[in-house]
Regions:
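S-adenosyl-L-methionine
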Residues: 1-85, 102, 106-154, 235
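Short, polar loop motifs at secondary-structure junctions
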Residues: 6-9, 92, 204-208
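Local beta-strand N-terminus motif with an aromatic residue
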Residues: 27, 83, 149-152, 198
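Residues at the starts of beta-strands that form the adenosine-phosphate
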Residues: 85, 106, 132, 199-200
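Conserved proline-anchored active-site loop of SAM-dependent methyltransferases
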Residues: 86-99, 149-165
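Mobile active-site "lid"/loop adjacent to the S-adenosyl-L-methionine
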Residues: 156-189
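Conserved Class I SAM-dependent methyltransferase catalytic core
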Residues: 185-232
Length: 235
């Protein structure tokens, strides 16, 4: 479903094609360079490519001084000790991680998908340390037991229908490379996260979505489109 363009450092397992070849062979997406950023887009399509850019565009506006403190995600973290570490165990494109880092938290991103890992790494390279963001590549289920963060943040992919056309497009692209986790996988990740966190686990969910892993949270920050479910640690 995915092809790497020849100008990328493609891993050994990847299919390397030109954009025209990818289109002719029915590949859904290509990974390549667009305007100096490693990006994802449909071959020969007109859609805007997806890249990780922590300081530009809509995300750059949201993390600007004086705005980020009003983000509901930041409010969901509550009061935390100084120098608190937040682990974003489902980093994706890193946007929520950037908001938390801009709010003053130390943020460690975990990402298992190799394509998203490359996009995040490129974004971090261009960020040049301007936000306290780090990335560890690998499965959160394997890495979290080795960490003791104050907060673990989870935002598992969810097939929400009431999204804008642009968000639906991006979500569809991501689902080609990172399928939606099963109920059992979600429940297991939540349990591991609650054992790792010292203060809380914060889960982002569509407002009308079921609880992650069918586990009732200890508290909630509701919203019209998105809510944040808060879980206390378990031993």
């Amino acid at each position: 479903m995915l092809a790497y363009l020849p100008d990328t450092h493609a891993p050994a397992w990847a299919t390397v094609l030109t954009e025209e070849e990818a289109h002719n062979q029915g590949k859904a997406l290509v990974l390549g360079w667009h305007e100096g950023r490693l990006s994802l887009w449909p071959p020969m399509g007109r859609e805007t490519p997806v890249a990780v850019d922590f300081l530009q565009g809509a995300l750059g506006y949201r993390i600007s001084q004086g705005r980020v403190k009003h983000e509901r995600l930041v409010k969901a973290m509550g009061r935390l000790p100084n120098n608190s570490l937040i682990v974003d165990a489902t980093a994706g494109l890193g946007r929520d991680s950037a908001l938390l880092a801009a709010a003053g938290f130390e943020v460690l991103m975990l990402e298992a998908n190799p394509v998203l890992q490359q996009l995040l790494s490129d974004g971090l390279l261009r960020l040049q340390g301007q936000l306290p963001l780090r990335l560890i590549t690998g499965r959160a289920e394997d890495i979290l037991p080795q960490l003791t963060p104050q907060v673990v943040y989870l935002d598992p992919m969810f097939p929400e229908r009431k999204k804008s056309a642009a968000v639906k497009k991006e979500l569809a692209w991501l689902q080609y490379i990172a399928p939606i986790p099963s109920h059992g996988e979600e429940a297991n990740l939540l349990k591991i996260a609650r054992r790792a966190a010292t203060h809380k686990v914060v889960v982002k969910r569509p407002a009308n979505a079921p609880f992650l892993g069918a586990e009732t949270p200890n508290s909630q920050l509701p919203g019209k489109a998105v809510r944040f479910d808060v879980y206390l640690p378990i031993s």
